[in-house]
Amino acid sequence: MFDVLMYLFETYIHNEAEMRVDQDRLTRDLTDAGFEREDIYNALLWLEKLADYQEGLVEPMQLASDPLSVRIYTAEECERLDASCRGFVLFLEQIQVLNLETREMVIERVMALDTAEFELEDLKWVILMVLFNIPGCENAYQQMEELLFEVNEGMLH
């Protein structure tokens, strides 16, 4: 499922392709690209839930705004998000790429993924997808994109 999300983000969203794509055509395109129908369905459902945030159909969790508060992760969240992932989320909060609401959206979308393995690189892409879809997060998206691509480009040299 995550591979389908990455393919969609890179092909349609990140490359600024036409956003109004018929779901049946999209499913055919993804099937032709070699993805399994179940993974396609799960990825599209995941994106629909993300779009609910964008359209205001789902309110993000209302949290205390005390800057000294610390997020305590559940056991299930700790299984999916290892220490490096949780540290990266905290880092993004500290540099104000994520706020309390977007952090919770990211965690919710990570937990909704149907994947056995999840790494820091995967988290970075989920964060990018969430920020891209949330109105008012354009600057945070740009910062995250710069962080993601500067680090990856630096590794090529």
UniProtKB/Swiss-Prot annotation:
Upper lineage: Bacteria, Pseudomonadati, Pseudomonadota, Gammaproteobacteria, Enterobacterales
Coiled coil, from the record: none
Protein name: Protein Smg
Listed Pfam families: DUF494
Protein's organism: Enterobacter sp. (strain 638)
Family: Belongs to the Smg family.
PANTHER family associated with the record: PROTEIN SMG
NCBIfam families: PRK03430.1
